[in-house]
Amino acid sequence: MPQFMSPAEKGFILSRHWKDTRHGVEVSYWLITDNGPRKVTVPLQQAIAFVPLSSLPAIKPLLDEQANLSYRPVELSDFRREKVAAIYCQQYRQLQNLDKRCQELGIELLETDIRPCERYLMERFITAPVWFSQNQQGEYQLKPCDSYRPLIKAVSLDIETSQYGELYSIGLSGCGDNVVFMLGPEQGSALNNTHRLVYVNSRPQLLDKLNEWLQQYDPDAIIGWNLIQFDLNVLQKHAERYGIPLQLGRQGKKLEWREHGFKQGVFFASAEGRLIIDGIDALKAATWNFPSFSLEFVAQDLLGEGKAIDSPYDRMDEINRRFHHDKPALAHYNIQDCLLVHRIFEKTDLMAFLQERSTVTGLAVDRMGGSVA
């Protein structure tokens, strides 16, 4: 009997996720659609790797002792044009452990580094735009849809701190709102009507306000300038200090971090259901080049305008002075940085470039520096 499927809808992949369960690998995606964000979960998957047929006898005893594992020859070849067998595991962690044991035997398994959420897309020739439909069990099926380019709703985030990294304020511009959350005591209202100025009594309350704003306005993307290595890094340290989760993902999911495999002290950040895009990395990915990638230099070059503090030499002193004696002026400086980043993205059409790159290559929209070979 044919399985009923809901009418197909168009979506564009924002983020990709997987987790092991007792019965298989759960794979899900957050999409932008014409009807808002959607989280879709596909039927349970197996974790898959390959091994040259010539190496199969050496690891066959190891494979045969594994529960919830199967293997068989397939009509595929490796780069040496040797036929391979596919190995199917019920959990991805099981496959990773198997890979380690095979390495100890001097046998290399192929494609063990491909995450289940990436493999699902690859095997269906899906890059970023998709058709999706749902069956009676609530599971989704995805198919490629090359023509869909939705509007990505972005918020520009910028923070101000002391020279010691102590948080002064958080500025947000996007989704119809411009606001600065400022550590008190209160020193007056916003200098003009371009933004709201909201005072709070403590740094934990600054983090709470950020979490609340993101859940209320629900952006598809968070953009900024040196966003991950500075702004989000400082916010994460404050979150750990005060025991407050940094809920930058949709459905209140916490910000996730991983360290660069080769560059010490360089980190990647991800938020479920949202893109995290650093303006500097995005411009470089789009082959823009400047003598300096400082926000002041790029803004002056592209927009003919710059920061709300003219001199770069005593900028830190001026930020400290404004925080202690003129908080409305600091809020103006903070929101101006947010607005500059937005205008740079618009001027260079960066978001459209990143969507197109993702559609052509299959790289995540906010993935920077990956190979497209």
Q: Would you name each region that the model predicts?
A:
Residues 1-280, 285-373:
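The two-metal-ion catalytic cores of nucleic-acid processing enzymes
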